[in-house]
Design a protein with these regions (language model features):
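Hydrophobic helix-and-loop "lid/oligomerization" segment in the mid-to-C-terminal part
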Residues: 1-50, 70-71, 88, 125-357, ...
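Flexible glycine-/small-residue-rich
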Residues: 26, 54, 76, 94-95, ...
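Active-site cavity-forming subdomains of large catalytic enzyme subunits
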Residues: 41-133
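Histidine-centered active-site/metal-ligand motif
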Residues: 79-80, 95, 279, 339, ...
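Mid-to-C-terminal polyanion-binding domains and interfaces
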Residues: 231-237, 241-273, 326-491
């Protein structure tokens, strides 16, 4: 994923800057998550004596022991949930180690790329102390904060404390367009304005992720490490193509998952669904969309040759990573790991129903047995006349937005739909008006088939209260304010 691509790229770029060339291995989906014996064998054939894992490895006991027996020193740089025991290797750098001090609680929120950046800072300080830079320039670590920001936002870790500082400064670095890979990807996505956390999470991130989902897993990391514009443009073009394919596959799997969930009883406060030969590259995205649709923790799995691979996304109140680790320790899963809001796992098909019961009962204990009613928290109420570029500028001072610091959700009261139509991939475009005069453009993304979209399309002229966010939209060099609709109710 993006956290893995950015953390491995950052480490590779730093090592290159101090004269050490380090090949990067990003596992293809068929190889499975985390380090594998195949990868260890490939590195051993190159004469490798130091193996570093990023964004994985904390619970990879067998493979890391295998690497040790091949004569390698091993270091893990990770942020996923740990077990009571740790691999017997040189170092496990992970703020979620169970023996880790609580002196700096904000470190427990770090993405893997944040862990790698702090490791690089510490190594750089030690090199300076030992006189390594007496006859060579020290690298400018700040220039890599764009990678730190990208991985942090895309891994949906809370944007609090150090993470907030990383993203705020990283966005400034990204606006300089120094990384030719990110520059090429932004150009491919027609992103010419100053980037925000929205662009990281919903424009650049999905394209980098697409390689690992439906194409070649290493493409994203290769792009971020690209050293010339031609190579970067070629890789950006490939990722854009992978992303288009990913959208098609995702729509198909999502439709099937919804049909299954709404056609069968769901006895627990979870959305638990599986299908045969669903593309494993999109099940994580589908889990996220099911979580949003039903307001429940979502488990989505693909069954292939009696083996099941799954992905889960959670809601506040349920640590999904801890659930997966508990199921693994109980013997229900063959592999698994994650953090508060997301997890991945594997199991045998014969254990599917046992895992459903375990996950459902675990969720019941955490969330209660009462039916979860999805709620939409509103931060403020405005009228149409207040939806101005100046007000949007003031809201942007609260950036970066993301997990732990969500974009302010506003209720736009007393408006009517003047015009509405469907554009793009099922988006509903509107022009809003008020009885006091004035107009405002609005968009409800991927809403054409939803109840909200149907209301916007079929009830023109009627009064509505709309919930959503106010953003500035730049197109062809022209900036306007736009309301992004999440929900609607009759006024």
């Amino acid at each position: 994923d993006v956290d893995g691509a950015t953390s491995s790229s950052l480490l590779k770029l730093f090592l290159h800057s101090v004269g050490c060339e380090a090949p990067v291995h990003i596992p293809e989906r068929e190889e499975g998550y985390g380090p594998s014996k195949t990868a260890v064998d490939e590195f051993a054939a190159l004469g490798t004596n130091l193996l570093i894992t990023t964004d994985c490895g904390t619970t990879a006991f067998e493979v890391l022991e295998y690497a040790k027996n091949k004569g390698m020193d091993v270091i893990v740089l990770d942020h996923h949930e740990a077990e009571t025991r740790l691999p017997d290797i040189c170092a496990v750098v992970n703020p979620k180690r169970l023996d880790e001090s609580d002196e700096y609680p904000c470190l427990k929120y770090l993405a893997a790329v944040g862990v790698v950046f702090l490791t690089v800072v510490a190594v750089n300080r030690e090199l300076r102390k030992r006189g390594f830079y007496q006859n060579r320039p020290a690298p400018d670590l700040m220039k890599w904060l764009d990678l730190v920001a990208l991985g942090t936002v895309c891994d949906v870790v809370p944007l609090l404390g150090l993470n907030r500082a990383f993203v705020r400064q990283g966005l400034k670095v990204m606006s300089l367009r120094q990384n030719c890979g990110l520059k090429a990807l932004a150009d491919k996505a027609s992103l010419s304005e100053a980037p925000t956390s929205y662009h990281l999470g919903f424009v650049l991130g999905p394209r980098i992720n697409a390689g690992g989902r439906v194409g070649e897993a290493s493409t994203g990391s290769r792009l971020l490490c690209a050293t010339d514009d031609f190579q970067a443009a070629m890789l950006a073009d490939r990722l854009d193509g992978f992303n288009a394919l990913r959208k098609e596959i995702e729509a198909y799997v999502l439709l099937q998952a919804i049909e299954i969930l709404e056609g069968t009883p769901q006895p627990y406060p979870i959305a638990f669904v599986y299908g045969h030969d669903w593309h494993q590259g999109v099940i994580g995205i589908v889990a996220g969309k099911l979580k949003e649709r039903y307001g429940l923790p979502a488990f989505v799995m693909s069954v292939e040759n009696d083996e099941v691979k799954g992905s889960a996304r959670s809601v506040p109140g349920l640590n999904i990573g801890a659930l997966v680790m508990a199921a693994k320790e109980k013997g229900l899963l063959t592999k698994g790991g994650g953090h508060n809001m997301a997890a991945g796992f594997s199991l045998e098909e014969k254990n599917l129903e046992a895992f459903r019961r375990f996950a459902g009962e675990y969720a019941e204990r955490a969330l209660g047995k009462e039916k979860i009613v999805p709620t939409l928290e509103i931060d403020g109420v405005i009228g149409l006349s207040a939806a101005t570029p100046e007000f949007a500028d003031k809201l942007s001072l609260l950036e970066p937005f993301g997990a732990g610091n969500p974009e302010p959700r506003l209720m736009l009261g007393g408006v009517r739909i003047i015009r509405s139509d469907i554009v793009g991939s099922g988006h509903v475009r509107c022009v809003l008006g008020s009885f006091a005069g004035g107009s405002l453009k609005a968009m409800a993304f991927r809403a054409a088939d939803s109840e909200v979209g149907k209301a916007l399309l079929n009830r023109r002229g009627e009064p509505f209260n709309l919930a959503g966010t106010l953003r500035k939209d730049t197109w062809m060099g022209r900036t306007q304010v736009q309301f992004v609709i999440e929900d609607a109710m009759r006024g």
